[in-house]
């Protein structure tokens, strides 16, 4: 036995960052213009643009999906509820009522292993719109909260 010998070992640890899929920005508030964009349904467009930014830096990327849910129907401070009034309209004109069940609003493509930033926006007659089924009370403001879910 040789007690004077000190053994040194070098160990290399490689940490690989596999990237991430992130929801970076979402328009925080938007309002609706009360002039209908549809003859047969009372659909109203947003006053301001709804823009969502998603960054995909995943090394092994795959298609991803963005869903929207609401915590409750549009409601005024006085408790007046506009049932089934927040809707999502896709590029084919198909209408889905927003609820606590996730509604698919966008499908993103794989990034091919490279950083990809996707800016999501919709035309005036697409995306999140206001559908009037009941009458509106004068001088009332209606609110609901949209939750966005990003899924790989």
Name each model-derived stretch:
Residues 96-108, 112-115:
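Extended, solvent-exposed, non-transmembrane regions
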Residues 85, 94-96:
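Carboxylate/His-rich catalytic cores and anion/metal-binding grooves
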Residues 3-89, 109-152:
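N-terminal small/polar-rich segments of proteins
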């Amino acid at each position: 036995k040789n007690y004077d010998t000190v053994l040194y070992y070098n160990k290399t640890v490689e940490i690989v960052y596999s990237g991430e899929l992130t929801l970076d920005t979402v328009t925080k508030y938007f309002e609706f213009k009360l002039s209908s964009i549809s003859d047969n349904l009372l659909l109203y467009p947003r006053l301001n643009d709804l823009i969502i930014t998603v960054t995909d830096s995943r090394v092994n990327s795959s298609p991803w999906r963005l869903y929207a849910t609401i915590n409750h129907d549009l409601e005024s401070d006085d408790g007046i509820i506009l049932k089934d009034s927040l809707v999502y309209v896709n590029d084919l004109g198909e209408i889905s009522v927003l609820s606590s069940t996730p509604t698919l609003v966008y499908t993103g493509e794989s990034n091919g292993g490279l950083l990809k930033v996707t800016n999501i926006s919709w035309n005036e007659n697409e995306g999140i719109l206001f559908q009037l089924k009941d009458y509106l009370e004068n001088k009332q403001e209606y609110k609901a909260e949209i939750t966005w879910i990003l899924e790989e």
